[in-house]
Every structure is written in structure tokens, then in C-alpha cells.
């Protein structure tokens, strides 16, 4: 992996009003062509100036625009390509760090690096082709080693630093705001700048008291030539550091002094990190010494392109700070980073947005066509940037009114929660009512359908006569067919024209013309009725074509041809072919791709049919009345492609007027509900009219067409011959709120930007021109440095001198130049040694001070340790030291908590009552022993051991009472053997006497021997002989 050094530039500001009042002299000189900076020691004018070379050097007359175009532009351009970048300003307080990073809005040339980075990022985003970007911004500060979110609801809340194996170090709970334009980024920057901690010092009236980091996170999705997405992510950190301070110059006291101490500690940790990275022998880099160095861990020696802007003060009053800044910057040049493109990050939010957009578009595409969806999305007006900013950014929190703001947020949350609950409850109630209405409609539909079927069974009894006559004529056909010389008495010619019940997904079908009904019918006298047209009952169901029925009846004596033109519709399954035509006819039809062959019409005997009444007219009229009710019970669904099947029906043998109401009713109804009703009606007709055919069709029905279970809104539709049957098998679409889905889709698409100015040639040319300028400036700097090296090289040796004197003069000039360099090197070594000596003295003083503090703490510990209770765990300090451990993240020791172990000694004599020892151990348990009680017990124990007479003449009863006390019995055991004899005899008391012992009296009453002298004497006389001397 290729590595690159940290780029370092220096910028020297003009003198401010304070320095001019102090009549300070400039000590810094800058050579912009060679990127060199020199500083002269004001205390040693004879010494040569110290010279430093960087990647860029800018003096007082240079503006921020030039700095950005020459140095910062390539780094920010790399961020839009997937690299990580960091730009941070370093220097003492009042040196112009915030001016370099933030800048001034007027004049435009002095705008800071941060707002220029905004313009650059969105310029690259808008010019990109086939790439979408998700740009987010965050703003934080480090104040007194506490991380705060400058864009959060509570800017004073402390945030924690976490570390992830893939993301690295990050701030937990930091708010990220999606931005779409430069205006939104500037608004975020201004909001965070107002919340930043600033203070007044003698060197700067608006001194930054914290380090701030503005982060721009970019996620990009590029589409290659193959149409595959490539996801990359880049991050740009714009760091404005607080300046190092000297208390003698800033006059910081109190809170300002505490802030200055924290600032100097963090900057010192940053310097240590830089020194450790430059020194190749150092194995440990102290990133954890400060939160600033932890957040910049990836920027210093990691996967980041880094630019350091060292800000200088030209005044001689700040010579030491300026020299220290130059040394730090010169050291940072040698840091090597290893930047790489962040490809396919696992936690990319842009990938989640793209997947959600695809899902939402799929949902909307099911409800509307893609063209209408794209038109609807294109008509949407993007929201006003100001309104978007107000939604993205919280309002600044007023410090003195935090509680009121919290209360307002709480009330708003409760109001939203109540509104959501009310909406949910109303939706549930509406759903319940809708289910009740659907159930009622279905019940009404079932009742009416059952009533209609019952009426049809009664009305179709007349059709039985038609079936009987039809069978009789079929059986007599053989007799008439054998005699060819007999002319037909009646000829019936049927012309069947196919009709298609069209839906949105209906497949195209071929036209089928005249169909032969049967080849076995005999010729009959021709009857020609009057012509009529089948009119459509509804303009909406215009899929059935109008057909004309032409029938000629010249007279009862002369036969004529009867042509009937009626619609025959598609059938949905073979089930109905077998059901209506029989097994043989259905098999014949299915074998020829479900179409009947075109043949000449045959003459059909139709004697006796002209006088029959039409039983279908009344039925179809009732079906038409139910159309509106049935249409509400079924939800609309998309139709599937259907294959039309043309079949003849027994109703073709009826009068032409008999078929008209059926066609009209089928055309009037919506596609699904009427087919449900009409199929049931026609099936009952076929069952009744043709019992023989129906019985023959039962076997093939079970084998050919087994209906599959479908949802309640779609089922197998059975229809009579001559009508089209459609089977709906599509699943119902998910019920979604189209407006909510559309609003979410628009919101997600607005989050993603990119390619808005892809066709703008002027903007692209400007973008390329600025990139070329940065490359040319870098080449010029490299050439200037090479020329500088040649000046100090051996080019002089190539000259040819005309005389010895000319050569001596040239050699003298070269020697003077080398002597100046030698003198500068000696001064530099002396300065480094002096700095090292000062640091060594400082380190030794710190070590001595820490040793004195350690000795003080050790002496205090030796004095305090004997006072610690023995039942406390801190009485054993060695164990506490073994259990303690250092917390690297928080920077303090984790020590055990103090614990007091409550212990009580067991009772020595088990025959006495337990209430008295419990009372005595309670004081010890509480940790507060009664010192007066202890002294009184000690006095009693001494009197017992010294007063021989009292011990000798002591009664048994008193000794029994005293023996119940464990501590008193222990004191008697410690007495001399001769004096403990009276008490030792009490231990020989039989166990039977133990329950008869009296209750013990209070301890203090034992010393009063006056009331019990007589009793003691009597008992002593009785036991005098038994007691040993």
C-alpha cells in the first residue's frame, strides 16, 4: 500500500492592534516561491535566522482562496473519490487558526477553508455522472476533555468515545444531518459556531476555549458500464484547534486558567503523538493520552490524507511560541500515512436507502403504471432548502431555559403519541365496521342466490320438454338420413360468430366463423323469423360485439333457411366442455386446441320448438337486478390471460330471441360477479335439460378439470355454453397507503444528490481548471526546491575562471555561504540542546515533586492504617493493591469498595439464656462500642481477682448468674488457680438444675451486696463444708 507524508503549510498573519501598541518588530520572513519560512531570534541579532521548508508558505498578503486552491483542493477532491481527509490548524492562541478555518463572509476571498470545502464538495457532486451521493454533516467540540455535540438538543451533554474494529474511533450519540446544498452546510456551521465555547483573554477577545471538529461524510454509488453498483465512502474532518497559551501573557485566572490547562495538555499530547510517529524506534504511540489525539488517530499515521496549517504570529513578543510551532510543523512533515479508498463499506446508509427505494417503487408499480409513476415523481416540487434546514436542524437551545425546552419536548411527544393512538383506534373501528358490512353483503348475496336457484329449479321444468323433443329428433335422424331422395321438411342454419369477453390481460384470439352444431340432425321445413339485434345493456362492458339475428319465414308451406348469429364466449376450463357437450364432443374439441372446426351449417329438425316459451328471459332479468349487489361484494383484482374456447350450447337450438336476454345480461354485469351468478344458473339448466349428457360427463370432469381452491374473492366460474368464463388466480395486492409510500419514496430520493449539473460544460471546465492549477502549483514548488538544491551543489566547479583572483573570490563567497550554514546549524544544535536541557530540568522537577507527594501520602497512610477497623477490607492494604487495576480509557484506578465484615463470637456456655449475649454483641455489630461499659467491666474483673474474701464467700447463685456471661467467664479463667476455685465448682452442677436457675439480673446490680448479705451467709453455711479451701 502506497504511503504519503502529511502535508504541512505555514501562514503568517499580520500584526494585530495589541502587537502594534506594544511596538513589536516582525521576526518572521516567508519565501512563497520556495515554501520556506525563516525566523530571527530577537535576542541574538548576530545569529543567522532559523530556516524551515514546508509544502507551502504564505505571508500576510496571501488570502485564504489561494491557500485552498493550491494545497487543500486536491485533498478535498480525494474525499469525493472515496478517501478520508483531514485539515487542521495548529498554533498559539490568537495566531489566526479560526480565521483560516472559518474565515469572513466579506470579502469573498477571505472565506475560510470550511465553507470553501462545502462549495467544492457539492460542485464535484453535481458534476458527477452516473453517481449518486449521500452527504451528511456533524459538528462537535472538545471542551475540558469533554466531547459535546454542537448540533444536538443539549449542547452541554457529555458524549462517550467508542472504538469499532471497522469504523475506528467514533463518538456515541453524535447527531448526523443530511445536507443537500451549500446553504444547508453553512447554516449548520453557523449554528454550531454559536454554540461553541469562546472566552476573552488578553491576547484574543474571542479566543476559542475548545477544539472543534466539523465532519462531512460522503457515501457514493457509481454505476459502471456493466450496470453494476460500486459503493464507496469518504470522510472529511475540518479541525479548528484551540491555541496554546502562557498564563503570563493571557492573564487567565479561575475558569480560564482551567481551560488553558486542559488545552495545553491536549496539545502536548498531540505533540507527543507527532514525535512518536516521527521516531521510528518508538513502539507505542500515546493516542489515548487525550481525546483529541484519539479522534485524530486515523488522521495521524492512519488511513487519511492529512493537511496541517501552522499559523504564526510575526511579532517578536511571540518568538518562543512561533518557534515551537515551526518545530512541531517541521516534525509533522515526516509522518507517513497510508490512505486508501474505502470501497463497499458494510455500514453504508446509502445502500439501505437504495434498497428501500426499490421496494417502495415496486409497491407503487403494482398500483400504477411505470409511466404514471415517473410522471408523478417528476411533478413533485423539491422542498424549500430553508424548510429542509429547519427540519434537519434543531433550534438552538437557550442555556437559561433548558427545563422549559425539556417540558415543551415532553408535551410535544405526548401530543404525538396521543394522536397516533387516536388514529390507530379510529382505523381499528373503521376496519371492524368494514368487515361487518362485507359480512352483511355476503350474507345477503348468499340468501338471494339461494332464492334464485330455488326459483330456477321450478322454472326449468319446462325445459325438460325441450330435451325430450331434442332426443326424439336425434333418434329419428337415422331414418331420414337413409332416404336421400326425401327433401328436408325444415332447415335450420346456425351461424356462430366468436365473441371475446375482453379484459386488460386477455390474450388475442382468432376468429371462428360458422360452426356445425351436429352432423346427425335431419332436415326440417325452414322458418324465417324477423331480424333483430342483440343490444348491449351497459356501455362499460363493451367487450361483446353486437350481432344480428336474421331468420326468414316465407310461409308454412315453403321451407327456408334460418340463420342465427349469436355470441359464443370463452370458457375457463375443460370442466364445462365435458359438462355441456359430453365426453366425446369435449375430447374432440380439446384435441383441436379448444376450437371448433369451420364447417358448413347443417339443417336441424326443429319441429315443435317455435311454440315453446322462453324460460331464460325471466331468469336473466333477475340476474340483471342482482348485478349491483354482487359487484360490491368482490374486491377488484387484475385479470389473468385467458384462452377463448368456442362451444355450441343446447340453447342454440332455441329461437333466436331466447338467446338475446342471456347475452345482454352477460354483457351488463361486471366480469366476476355476473359470471358467478350466471354460471350457477346455466349449470342448473344444463343439468335439468340434458340428464343423459350430464351423467356421461361426470367421469371426464373429475379427470380433466379439477378446480383448485382459491381465495374468497376469486373462484372457479361455471357458465353455460355460449358465454365466456374467466378464472382469477392472482393473489390480492397488499393494502398500502399510496400517499404514505409516495411521500416516503420522495423523501428518500431527496436525501440522495448527484448529477444535477452533469450537462453543464462551464461548471465542468471550471472544475478541471482548478484541478490543473493545483497540479501546476505542485510542479512549480518541486522545481523551485530542485533549483535550491542545485544552488548549494557543485555547479561552481563547472565554471572556468579567467584568473586566480576570480576563482579566489568565488571560492570565498562559497566559503562564506557554507560558514553561515554551519553557524545556523550550530545555533540550531545549541537551541535543541537548551530545549532538551529545559525539558530535562522540567522532568526532574516534576519527578521530585511527585516523589515528595508520594512520601507525604505514604506517611499519612502509615498513620491512618492502625485506625482502620480489623473487620474492614482496607485493613489489609497489600490485598487492596493486588485487587486494584488501571483503567486506560477513563484514566483512573479501579479500587475495591470498602466492606465491613460483621462477625460475632459464639457463646461459651450454652446453658444460659441467649438474650443477654445478643444484647452485648449488638454494639459490636453496629461498629460503636460503649467505652464506659468496657471500663466498668474491667474494674469488676480487677475487683474479682484482688478481693479474696468476696470470692471466697461468694454464693453459688451469684456465680451461676455470672457464669452465663461469656466474657465474665473468660475473665475468671484468666484469674489465678487458687482464686478460681469457687467458680470452678459451679461447672459441676448437674444438668437437672439448669432449668431451675433464676433469670439473670442487670449487670450493674451485682455490685450491690447489701440486700443479699443474709441470703449469701445462709447459703454459704450450708455449703461451707463442701467447698474446698
UniProtKB/Swiss-Prot annotation:
Main location: cytoplasm
InterPro entries recorded: Kinesin-like_fam, Kinesin_motor_CS, Kinesin_motor_dom, Kinesin_motor_dom_sf, P-loop_NTPase
Segments of skewed composition (Low complexity): 532-551
Keyword check for Protein transport: yes
MF term (GO), any: microtubule binding
Subunit and partners: Homodimer. Interacts with APBA1 (via PDZ domain); the interaction is direct and is required for association of KIF17 with the cargo that is to be transported. Interacts with IFT B complex components IFT52 and IFT57. Interacts with IFT70B. Interacts with PIWIL1. Interacts with TBATA.
Protein name: Kinesin-like protein KIF17
Species of the source: Homo sapiens (Human)
Gene this protein is translated from: KIF17
Amino acid at each position: 500500500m502506497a504511503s504519503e507524508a502529511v502535508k504541512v503549510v505555514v501562514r503568517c498573519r499580520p500584526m494585530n492592534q495589541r502587537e502594534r501598541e506594544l511596538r513589536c518588530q516582525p521576526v518572521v520572513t516567508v519565501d512563497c516561491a520556495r515554501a520556506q519560512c525563516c525566523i530571527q531570534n530577537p535576542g541574538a541579532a548576530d545569529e543567522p535566522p532559523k530556516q524551515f521548508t514546508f509544502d507551502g508558505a504564505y505571508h500576510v498578503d496571501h488570502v485564504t482562496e489561494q491557500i485552498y486552491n493550491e494545497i487543500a483542493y486536491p485533498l478535498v477532491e480525494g474525499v469525493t473519490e472515496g478517501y478520508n481527509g483531514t485539515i487542521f490548524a495548529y498554533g498559539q492562541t490568537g495566531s489566526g487558526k479560526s480565521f483560516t478555518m472559518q474565515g469572513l463572509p466579506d470579502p469573498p476571498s477571505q472565506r475560510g477553508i470550511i465553507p470553501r470545502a462545502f462549495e467544492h464538495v457539492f460542485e464535484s457532486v453535481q458534476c458527477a455522472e452516473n453517481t449518486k451521493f449521500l452527504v451528511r454533516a456533524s459538528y462537535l467540540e472538545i471542551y475540558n476533555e469533554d466531547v459535546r455535540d454542537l448540533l444536538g438538543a443539549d449542547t452541554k451533554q457529555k458524549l462517550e468515545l467508542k472504538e469499532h474494529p471497522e469504523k475506528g474511533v467514533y463518538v456515541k450519540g453524535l447527531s448526523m444531518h443530511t445536507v443537500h446544498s451549500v446553504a444547508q452546510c453553512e447554516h449548520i456551521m453557523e449554528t454550531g459556531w454559536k454554540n461553541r465555547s469562546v472566552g476573552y483573554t488578553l491576547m484574543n477577545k474571542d479566543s476559542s476555549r475548545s477544539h472543534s471538529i466539523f465532519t462531512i461524510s460522503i457515501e457514493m454509488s457509481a454505476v459502471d458500464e456493466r450496470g453494476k453498483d460500486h459503493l464507496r465512502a469518504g470522510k472529511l474532518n475540518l479541525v479548528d484547534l484551540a491555541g496554546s497559551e502562557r498564563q503570563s501573557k493571557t492573564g487567565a485566572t479561575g475558569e480560564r486558567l482551567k481551560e488553558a490547562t486542559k488545552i495545553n495538555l491536549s496539545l502536548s499530547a498531540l505533540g507527543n503523538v507527532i514525535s512518536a510517529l516521527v521516531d521510528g524506534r518508538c513502539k507505542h504511540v500515546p493516542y489515548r493520552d487525550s481525546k483529541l489525539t484519539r479522534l485524530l488517530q486515523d488522521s495521524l499515521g492512519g488511513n487519511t490524507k492529512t493537511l496541517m496549517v501552522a499559523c504564526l504570529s510575526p511579532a517578536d513578543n511571540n518568538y518562543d511560541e512561533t518557534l515551537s510551532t515551526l518545530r512541531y510543523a517541521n516534525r509533522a512533515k515526516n509522518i507517513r500515512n497510508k490512505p486508501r479508498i474505502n470501497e463497499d463499506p458494510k455500514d453504508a446508509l446509502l445502500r439501505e436507502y437504495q434498497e428501500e427505494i426499490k421496494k417502495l417503487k415496486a409497491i407503487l408499480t403494482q398500483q400504477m403504471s411505470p409511466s404514471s409513476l415517473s410522471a408523478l415523481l417528476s411533478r413533485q416540487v423539491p422542498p424549500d432548502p430553508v424548510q429542509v434546514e429547519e427540519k434537519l436542524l434543531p433550534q438552538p437551545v437557550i442555556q437559561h431555559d433548558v427545563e422549559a425546552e425539556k417540558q415543551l419536548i415532553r408535551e410535544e411527544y405526548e401530543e404525538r403519541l396521543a394522536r397516533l393512538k387516536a388514529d390507530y383506534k379510529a382505523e381499528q373501528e373503521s376496519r371492524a365496521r368494514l368487515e361487518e358490512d362485507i359480512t352483511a353483503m355476503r350474507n345477503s348475496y348468499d340468501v338471494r342466490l339461494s332464492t334464485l336457484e330455488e326459483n330456477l329449479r321450478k322454472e326449468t321444468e319446462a325445459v325438460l320438454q325441450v330435451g325430450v323433443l331434442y332426443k326424439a329428433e336425434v333418434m329419428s335422424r337415422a331414418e331420414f338420413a337413409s332416404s336421400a331422395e326425401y327433401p328436408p321438411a325444415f332447415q335450420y342454419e346456425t351461424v356462430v360468430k366468436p365473441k371475446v369477453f375482453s379484459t386488460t390481460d386477455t390474450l388475442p384470439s382468432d376468429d371462428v366463423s360458422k360452426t356445425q352444431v351436429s352432423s346427425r340432425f335431419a332436415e326440417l321445413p325452414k322458418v324465417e323469423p324477423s331480424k333483430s339485434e342483440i343490444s348491449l345493456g351497459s356501455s362499460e362492458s363493451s367487450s361483446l360485439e353486437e350481432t344480428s339475428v336474421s331468420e326468414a319465414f316465407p310461409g308454412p308451406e315453403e321451407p327456408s333457411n334460418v340463420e342465427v348469429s349469436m355470441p359464443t364466449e370463452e370458457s375457463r376450463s375443460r370442466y364445462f366442455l365435458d359438462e355441456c357437450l359430453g365426453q366425446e364432443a369435449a375430447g374432440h374439441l380439446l384435441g383441436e386446441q379448444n376450437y371448433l372446426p369451420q364447417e358448413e351449417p347443417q339443417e336441424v329438425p326443429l319441429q315443435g320448438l317455435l311454440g315453446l316459451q322462453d324460460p331464460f328471459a325471466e331468469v336473466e332479468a333477475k340476474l340483471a337486478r342482482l348485478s349491483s349487489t354482487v359487484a360490491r361484494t368482490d374486491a377488484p383484482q387484475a385479470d389473468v390471460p385467458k384462452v377463448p374456447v368456442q362451444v355450441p350450447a343446447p340453447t342454440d337450438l332455441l329461437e333466436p330471441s331466447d338467446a338475446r336476454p342471456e347475452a345482454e345480461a352477460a354483457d351488463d354485469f361486471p366480469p366476476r360477479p355476473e359470471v358467478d351468478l350466471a354460471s350457477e344458473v346455466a349449470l342448473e339448466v344444463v343439468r335439468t335439460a340434458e340428464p343423459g349428457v350430464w351423467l356421461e360427463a361426470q367421469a371426464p370432469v373429475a379427470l380433466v378439470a379439477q378446480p383448485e381452491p382459491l381465495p374468497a374473492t376469486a373462484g372457479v366460474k361455471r357458465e353455460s355454453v355460449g358465454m365466456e368464463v374467466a378464472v382469477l388466480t392472482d393473489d390480492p395486492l397488499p393494502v398500502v397507503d399510496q400517499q404514505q409510500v409516495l411521500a416516503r419514496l420522495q423523501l428518500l430520493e431527496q436525501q440522495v444528490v448527484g448529477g444535477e449539473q452533469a450537462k453543464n460544460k462551464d461548471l465542468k471546465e471550471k472544475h478541471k481548471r482548478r484541478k490543473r492549477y493545483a497540479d501546476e502549483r505542485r510542479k512549480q514548488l518541486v522545481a523551485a526546491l530542485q533549483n535550491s538544491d542545485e544552488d548549494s551543489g557543485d555547479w561552481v566547479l563547472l565554471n572556468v575562471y579567467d584568473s586566480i583572483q576570480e576563482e579566489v573570490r568565488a571560492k570565498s563567497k562559497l566559503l562564506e555561504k557554507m560558514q553561515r550554514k554551519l553557524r545556523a546549524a550550530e545555533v540550531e544544535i545549541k537551541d535543541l540542546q537548551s530545549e532538551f536541557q529545559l525539558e530535562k530540568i522540567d522532568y526532574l522537577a516534576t519527578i521530585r515533586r511527585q516523589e515528595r507527594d508520594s512520601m507525604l501520602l505514604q506517611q499519612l497512610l502509615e498513620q491512618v492504617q492502625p485506625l482502620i477497623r480489623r473487620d474492614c477490607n482496607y485493613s489489609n492494604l497489600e490485598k487492596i493493591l493486588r485487587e486494584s487495576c488501571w483503567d486506560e480509557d477513563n484514566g483512573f484506578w479501579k479500587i475495591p469498595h470498602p466492606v465491613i465484615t460483621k462477625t460475632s463470637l459464639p457463646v461459651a456456655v450454652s446453658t444460659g439464656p441467649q438474650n443477654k449475649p445478643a444484647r452485648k454483641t449488638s454494639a459490636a455489630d453496629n461498629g460503636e462500642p460503649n467505652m464506659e461499659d468496657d471500663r466498668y467491666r474491667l474494674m469488676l474483673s480487677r475487683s474479682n481477682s484482688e478481693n479474696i474474701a468476696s470470692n471466697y464467700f461468694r454464693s453459688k447463685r451469684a456465680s451461676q448468674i455470672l457464669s452465663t456471661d461469656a466474657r465474665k467467664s473468660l475473665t475468671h479463667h484468666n484469674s489465678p488457680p487458687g482464686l478460681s476455685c469457687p467458680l470452678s465448682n459451679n461447672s459441676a452442677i448437674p444438668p437437672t438444675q439448669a432449668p431451675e436457675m433464676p433469670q439473670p439480673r442487670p449487670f450493674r446490680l451485682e455490685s450491690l451486696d447489701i440486700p443479699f448479705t443474709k441470703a449469701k451467709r445462709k447459703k454459704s453455711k450450708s455449703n461451707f463444708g463442701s467447698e474446698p479451701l
